[in-house]
Amino acid sequence: MSKIRGNRKTRVGVVISDKMDKTVVVKVDQMVKHPIYKKYIKRRVTFKAHDEENRCNVGDKVSVVETRPLSRDKRWRVREILEKNVIL
C-alpha cells in the first residue's frame, strides 16, 4: 500500500543565496496577465528552500517542491539541480 500525497506545487527558480546551513533562497519568476489591461507582467517571488546536503550554489537553476513546514520560513525543499551556475 503506497501513500499518495496530494498535489504538491513545484516551481523552477534560481538560487540567489546559499549563506545559511541547509537552506537556500530561490528566486522564481512568473508572467502574470493583468486582469484589466491584459498586459503580461513579470512577478518575482523568493522562497527559502531546504537543501539537505548543501549541494546548491548561487546561480544554480533548481526545481523546488512544496513540503511540510520545516521552520518559520521554510515550506519548500530542493528536488533537483537542473543546471549549474546559470547567470543571474
Swiss-Prot record:
It comes from the Bacteria. CDD domains: Ribosomal_uS17. Transmembrane segments: none annotated. Disulfide bonds: none annotated. GO terms for cellular component: cytosolic small ribosomal subunit. GO terms for molecular function: rRNA binding; structural constituent of ribosome. Keywords: Ribonucleoprotein, Ribosomal protein, RNA-binding, rRNA-binding. One of its GO terms (biological process) is translation. One of the primary rRNA binding proteins, it binds specifically to the 5'-end of 16S ribosomal RNA. This is Small ribosomal subunit protein uS17. It comes from Syntrophotalea carbinolica (strain DSM 2380 / NBRC 103641 / GraBd1). The lineage of its organism: Bacteria, Pseudomonadati, Thermodesulfobacteriota, Desulfuromonadia, Desulfuromonadales. The gene is rpsQ.
